[in-house]
Amino acid sequence: MNNSNRLRLTWISYFSYALTGALVIVTGMVMGNIAEYFNLPIASMSNTFTFLNAGILISIFLNAWLMEIIPLKRQLVFGFILMLIAIAGLMVGHNLMIFSISMFILGVVSGITMSIGTFLITHMYEGRQRGSRLLFTDSFFSMAGMIFPVAAAILLARHIEWYWVYACIGLLYVGIFVLTLCSEFPVLGHKATDQSKPVAKEKWGMGVLFLAIAALCYILGQLGFIQWVPEYATKTFNMDISQAGQLVSNFWISYMIGMWVFSFILRFFDLQRIVTVLAALATLSMYMFVSTNNPEHLSYYILALGFVSSAIYTTLITLGSLQTKVSSPKLVNFILTCGTVGTMLTFVVTGPIVANSGVHAALATANGLYLTVFVMCLILGFFTKHRSHGHVTH
């Protein structure tokens, strides 16, 4: 593979994470406007976003096998067509069924693209370089989380319809589409070389179970927290939508900076030990945010939370890919799928909590999930295989 092609594939991975980040994170900003558009209470409206998360989950799960059947390039081109259909559905369809179907299609496109992006990085890079590359790739998720809530707030403040936010997000896939047409992709499945055969036979080990639980709890906790921060800030502290949007942007700015910092730091530390420390610090930072009664402190705590939690999910994926001697697409997709289950459950879990006990209870639940991540990372230390495979020295 020549360097220019590798660079194009790497940028496809970057944009794939930005696309998923934009779709998932912007939900909290537009939810109120969409609820008003369909004349539904916000707690009920949140349940319809499960279609987005379900689409992401199903496509990531199935793509572990589809990547070996349908060429990656063909999947991404087909994804572009689906993206156009979904955004057109949001714009011209004025009923809840069309909205739900369009969100599901967006989820499918996002999941396919993200699973391909993750595989490309794990395929092209090895050892600790894989971890730092994945972390930098994941920073585009948070970069989108920084940019699109601000863009959404600007559009909504000017009384521009909410669906134009999704049209803006669709521009990311235009970039993916153009790069895809110019790139050559690795071949998987029966057409690939025999090097991929040992991957299917190698046992994953118990460590993968703890990584999977940690990935699920982390994403569920993170999104359960950040999706309700705007509602919490406006209702509890009487902030306006711009101030609430700034809180969310602060989180993702800090998250992005943390990723860049840790993409250099991680190569000097054992991945299991550092992810355990980061999970503990993230749990403490979220507790401080949820517990404070001073609105002036919210920005400090959410900045700290964004920074220390930035490397957790990507490190979990990297540790998963290092549980076998040869990187397995199915193992990586399994960890991704578990994380995406957390995405899908975000409003299924937090919606009823908000309806029955209020937004603060949902944030406290997210804090408990972060504590679970810490416990899983701690236990992982007794079962992980990444040291015995020699990956720690790469």
UniProtKB/Swiss-Prot annotation:
* Membrane protein topology class: Multi-pass membrane protein
Classify the main location.
membrane
User: Pfam family example for this protein?
Assistant: MFS_1
Keyword check for Chloroplast, yes or no.
no
Question: Does this entry carry the keyword Metal-binding?
Answer: no
Provide any one GO MF term from the record: transmembrane transporter activity
What cellular-component terms does GO give this entry? plasma membrane
InterPro entries per record? MFS (IPR011701), MFS_dom (IPR020846), MFS_trans_sf (IPR036259), MFS_TsgA (IPR023528), MFS_TsgA-like (IPR050375)
Q: Where are the transmembrane segments?
A: 11-31, 51-71, 76-96, 101-121, 134-154, 162-182, 206-226, 246-266, 274-294, 302-322, 334-354, 363-383
Keywords in alphabetical order, please.
Cell inner membrane, Cell membrane, Membrane, Transmembrane, Transmembrane helix
Subcellular localization is given as: Cell inner membrane
Q: Which family does it belong to?
A: Belongs to the major facilitator superfamily. TsgA family.
What is the name attached to this protein's record?
Protein TsgA homolog
Specify the taxonomic lineage: Bacteria, Pseudomonadati, Pseudomonadota, Gammaproteobacteria, Enterobacterales
